[in-house]
């Protein structure tokens, strides 16, 4: 079990083979461009080792052998004809293992499963984004050596990864050999995918050039510079190849106090549009030192992370857990380009294939929109770069405009697993992207982005919905869809889908009237009549709402049983189902649908009853998706149920630390972890940003002394502080902003304090 120290460290105190796969995910180091799992330097075990570059993907064989053991799986979940045809899938590709560092002490190579471990500690320093390990090891002959390892993915130079490893003899004078290099024998999905072009081996450096696979053939180059030291003096080294290992080695005599290797790795691909790809061999001549690179990295990381860091006062454990969650949320974001976007596992594992889902715009984008908008902008430009393929998707469906795939990768066509029925019905993804664009603009007023990218996407998204809806009983309806709750496919008028579509249509018309230019309209030929059609559909789209104020998740939802009939052996548990349930007969849902409207989307729904809906749907949700927990935390805060808020917040920050869903080894739950930040911002502090004001509704939380965070609203950086029943906003920017609190408007310039 991992522990917390000094509000910044996540620490492992013993070597445990059982938790090694899970902790490899948790100890990932990354910088948005690359992610490197926390595997051991001396040996990268299969399914534990993993190094990834954002957008470095190709095709793999994916073996899957599910079977249907109840009516629900047979008729509603699997398409068994397509299951027979499925064998290939796009996936992120595991790079060569460049972490390889081994120490030979006398005749014994250090491995933690050999000899005796006298002490062991691995720690992730979230304040510096550095991963460290310290081991005291006794070999079979009783020789004791202390090993210290340190590594980080540079925030100063995103293509650089730095490592340092040291051996310190304690009771012997044995010679020490350090072996540092690259292990090319790696697998993705259990198979060898990389296509090697060439390798170069020098006395103090290595270069490996390979391609992602046979479909895309993305070329990657990795250069490694090794410098070996004995008591601070540079040592001679040689280069050699041993089967799959590309190595630099230095054999040093006994009697030294400290033996060290400093290892600098540069990674680049031909998709990066970076001159490093053509000049990578020159990095072996680099005279930069590990300490200099470390100092520059810490400086850049500290500045970057300070935008996101929330301080919880009076609860050090929760403060550390939140900082860990925020760390993983933000290392998924690329600050420099839009080659790829925010994926569900970030760059911490192979599972979910580095695909981009609706999680991106709804769960992951808010932390960046409010704290570092440039990353959010890159994520949305990623969507724009796939607009043409989204147009083709709409045509294939017989619709106009653009339909975005439920799952995307390098391409904008659908990449979801073909044997599952529901993803092809989850058309809400197209509205989710529209919502993300609008949310970004509300908080940034980035007119240039809208002119170059945003409006064109919004117009095409609206065109899709206008052609998608069906006129029935005097209203426009959306039939045969799946909402966010994947347990219920083939439903009519899903609440989440209809409400978010209506919002995107309505807001697009509003933004068009206030901000759009004829240049964008002319580019895609949007006409006045089309704008009228968009307005009409937004006005007449059916929005589910009962007279009681309850919102049915879809047509006929309340007619289903509130119990879940169980039938079968439970093969569905591998597909995020807690039981072998006949979900099509039950109101039991996988994750929030209706409650997203009130929490993440912040819709003010006339005549609805928020608390009654929350009371109902909380009980119907089996929480088999991690995305449940931050939503439920916010809803609990809105209902002034602060103990419930704390419990759901605990599940949000601990989803992977405590391995709540028993799959942390596959990679962290980036959407849920991003929700930890948003649960404080939106839930506890009650901050909702509108285009013309900030609304606040802070909550008294008796378990903590206070909370502090910073956010950006329309270029104004604001510090928010919650201390008991006093809430304060402060800013050095003199721009005036309207703030609404308890029905009263305040003019906020540099400081605003309210009591509640």
UniProtKB/Swiss-Prot annotation:
UniProt keyword annotations, A-Z: Cytoplasm, Glycosyltransferase, Transferase
GO BP, sorted A to Z: carbohydrate metabolic process
Keyword check for Zinc: no
Record GO cellular component, one term: cytoplasm
Single GO term (MF): carbohydrate binding
Main localization, broad class: cytoplasm
Pfam families reported in the protein's UniProt record: Glyco_hydro_65m (PF03632), Glyco_hydro_65N (PF03636)
Protein EC: 2.4.1.282
Sections of the chain in a coiled coil: none
Record note on pH: Optimum pH is 6.5.
Protein's cellular compartments: Cytoplasm
Keyword Glycosyltransferase tagged: yes
Sites where the protein binds substrate: 358-359, 590-591
Catalysed reactions, semicolon-separated: 3-O-alpha-D-glucosyl-L-rhamnose + phosphate = beta-D-glucose 1-phosphate + L-rhamnopyranose
Active-site positions on this chain: 486 (proton donor)
InterPro entries for the chain: 6-hairpin_glycosidase_sf (IPR008928), 6hp_glycosidase-like_sf (IPR012341), Gal_mutarotase_sf_dom (IPR011013), Glyco_hydro_65_M (IPR005195), Glyco_hydro_65_N (IPR005196), Glyco_hydro_65_N_sf (IPR037018), Malt_Pase/Glycosyl_Hdrlase (IPR017045)
Family named by the database record: Belongs to the glycosyl hydrolase 65 family.
Subunit (UniProt): Monomer.
Role played: Phosphorylase showing strict alpha-1,3-regioselectivity and producing 3-O-alpha-D-glucopyranosyl-L-rhamnopyranose. Specific for L-rhamnose as acceptor and beta-D-glucose 1-phosphate as donor. Does not phosphorylate alpha,alpha-trehalose, kojibiose, nigerose, or maltose.
Protein name from the UniProt record: 3-O-alpha-D-glucosyl-L-rhamnose phosphorylase
């Amino acid at each position: 079990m991992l522990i917390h120290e000094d509000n910044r460290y996540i620490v492992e105190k013993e070597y445990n083979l059982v938790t090694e796969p899970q902790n490899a995910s948790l100890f990932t180091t990354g910088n948005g461009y690359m992610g490197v799992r926390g595997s051991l330097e001396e040996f990268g075990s299969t399914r534990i080792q993993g190094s990834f570059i954002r957008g470095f993907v190709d095709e793999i064989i994916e073996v899957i052998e599910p079977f249907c053991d109840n009516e629900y799986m047979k008729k509603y979940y699997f398409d068994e004809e397509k299951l027979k045809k499925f064998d290939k899938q796009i996936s992120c590709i595991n790079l060569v293992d460049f972490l390889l560092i081994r120490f030979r002490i006398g005749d014994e190579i250090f491995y933690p499963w050999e000899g005796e471990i006298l002490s062991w500690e691995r720690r992730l320093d979230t304040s510096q984004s550095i991963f460290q390990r310290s081991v005291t090891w006794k070999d079979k002959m009783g020789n004791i050596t202390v090993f210290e390892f340190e590594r980080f993915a540079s925030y100063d130079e995103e293509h650089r990864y730095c490592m340092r490893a040291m051996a310190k003899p304690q009771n012997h004078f044995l010679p020490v050999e350090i072996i540092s290099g690259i292990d090319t024998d790696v697998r993705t999905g259990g198979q060898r995918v990389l296509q090697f072009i060439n390798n170069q081996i020098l006395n103090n450096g290595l270069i490996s050039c390979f391609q992602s696979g046979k479909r895309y053939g993305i070329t990657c180059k990795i250069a490694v510079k090794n410098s070996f030291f004995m008591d601070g003096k540079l040592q001679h080294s040689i280069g050699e190849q041993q089967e799959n290992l590309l190595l630099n080695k230095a054999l040093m005599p006994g009697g030294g106090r400290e033996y060290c290797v400093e290892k600098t790795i540069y990674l680049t691909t031909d998709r990066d549009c970076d001159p490093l790809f053509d000049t990578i061999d020159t990095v072996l001549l680099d005279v930069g030192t590990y300490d200099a690179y470390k100092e520059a990295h810490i400086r850049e990381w500290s500045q970057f992370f300070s935008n996101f860091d929330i301080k919880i006062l009076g609860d050090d454990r929760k403060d550390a857990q939140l900082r860990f969650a925020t760390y993983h949320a933000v290392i998924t974001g690329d600050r420099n380009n839009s080659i790829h976007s925010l994926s569900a596992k970030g760059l911490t594992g192979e599972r979910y294939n580095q695909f981009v889902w609706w999680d991106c715009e709804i769960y992951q984008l808010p932390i960046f929109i409010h704290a570092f908008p440039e990353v959010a902008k890159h994520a949305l430009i990623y969507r724009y770069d796939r607009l043409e393929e989204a147009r083709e998707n709409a045509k294939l469906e017989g619709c106009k405009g653009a339909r975005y795939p439920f799952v995307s990768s390098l391409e904008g066509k659908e990449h979801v697993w073909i044997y599952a029925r529901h993803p092809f019905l989850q058309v809400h993804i197209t509205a989710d992207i529209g919502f993300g664009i609008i949310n970004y603009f509300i908080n940034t007023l980035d007119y240039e982005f809208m002119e170059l990218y945003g409006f064109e996407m919004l117009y095409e998204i609206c065109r899709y919905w206008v052609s998608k809806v069906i006129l029935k009983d005097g209203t426009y309806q959306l039939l045969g869809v799946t909402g966010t709750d994947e347990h219920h496919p083939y439903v009519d008028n899903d609440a989440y889908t209809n409400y978010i579509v209506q919002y995107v249509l309505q807001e697009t018309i509003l933004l068009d009237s206030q901000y759009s230019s004829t240049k964008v309209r002319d580019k895609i030929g949007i006409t006045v009549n089309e704008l009228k059609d968009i307005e009409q559909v937004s006005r007449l789209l059916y929005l589910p709402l009962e007279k009681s104020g309850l919102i049915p998740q879809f047509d006929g939802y309340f007619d289903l049983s509130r119990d879940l009939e169980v039938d079968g052996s439970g093969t569905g548990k591998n597909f995020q189902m807690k039981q072998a349930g006949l979900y099509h007969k039950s109101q039991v849902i996988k994750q929030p649908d209706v409650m997203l409207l009130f929490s993440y989307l912040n819709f003010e729904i006339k005549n609805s009853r928020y608390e009654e809906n929350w009371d109902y749907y909380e009980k119907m949700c089996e929480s088999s998706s991690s995305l449940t927990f931050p939503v439920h935390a916010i809803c609990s805060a809105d209902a002034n149920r602060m103990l419930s808020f704390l419990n759901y917040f605990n599940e949000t920050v601990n989803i992977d630390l405590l391995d709540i869903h028993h799959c942390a080894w596959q990679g962290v739950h980036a959407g849920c972890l991003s929700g930890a930040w948003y649960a404080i911002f939106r839930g506890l502090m009650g901050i909702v940003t509108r285009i013309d004001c900030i609304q606040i509704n802070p909550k008294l939380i008796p378990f903590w002394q206070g909370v502090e965070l910073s956010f950006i609203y329309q270029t104004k950086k604001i510090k928010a502080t919650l201390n008991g029943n006093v809430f304060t906003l402060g800013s050095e920017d003199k721009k005036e902003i309207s703030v609404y609190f308890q029905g009263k408007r305040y003019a906020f310039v540099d400081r605003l304090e309210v009591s509640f």
